[in-house]
Amino acid sequence: MFVEDKNFSWSSKYNPGTDKPFIMSRSKIDLYLKCKRCAYLDMRLGIKGPKPFPYNLNSRIDYLLKVEHDIAREKKEKTKYLEECNIDAIPYSHPDLDVWREPFKAARYHHKETNIVVAGSVDDLWEDNQSKKIHIVDYKSTHTENFEKLKNFDAPYLIGYKRQAEIYAWILSKLDLDIHQISYFLYVNATLEQKTFNNKLDFEYALIPYKMRDFNWVEDTIIEIKNFLETNKIPAATNDCELCKYMHKFFEFIKKKN
């Protein structure tokens, strides 16, 4: 069972030389891989970027999907998604699952070499009926006219979702779960067929499999981030970082005005 460790806290920034573990969320790893300057400002200096827009409707859909799966979990049977897609698995039961799903508790692994606690909140887990291995499952909701194209799961922006699954897989493998190489994205899409609102939205869905890479890259990245956070030099801006480009133009404008 999960026991809260009082030595762990969601620190605002990393303090070099401290013996207190630093909790690093899955999103911070992703931030580091996207833009090292933004990651340094965030994790080392405590200067956060703008908060993402709150996707309240998406959160509600996630909640309802979890309820559906929890009903099936209690009965030890498939959901309609697993049944209709011929996936031989059922929602996985574990005493810590509710904790692993909760954002500010989450699934955590203390990487002793770096003294970093890596944390991530999973949406769901399925157990393969044959191998008994565990599938990582993530819920996604959207509205797109190109849902068929999305199902190919090869757009460049989706790399973040793929990394997300692999980070969860790494954490849970360290918590002694036998992880299946195939993870699933349960995507729901608001349909184009609906012509009027009538206080509801109609959705179609797709269950998209993703064959994960060897997720041991996560540990290499954690060690890299640890060394990165120990330095005192702010990295150069990343060319394709929208926030860095905005800040560059902003300061150029201020200089001209002054």
Predicted features and spans:
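Short histidine-centered catalytic/ligand-binding loop motif
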Residues: 54-55, 147-159, 204-211
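Metal-dependent nuclease catalytic cores that hydrolyze phosphodiester bonds in DNA/RNA
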Residues: 1-133
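Metal-dependent nuclease catalytic regions and adjoining charged, substrate-binding loops involved
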Residues: 15-18, 23-24, 171-258
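An active-site-proximal "capping" alpha-helix that borders the catalytic cofactor pocket
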Residues: 161-173
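Non-catalytic protein-protein interaction segments used by genome-maintenance enzymes to assemble
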Residues: 109-163, 218
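A structural signal for short, well-ordered beta-strand segments and their strand-loop junctions
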Residues: 40, 126, 135-139, 180-187
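Short connector loops/turns at beta-strand edges and beta->alpha or beta->beta junctions
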Residues: 46, 140-145, 190-192
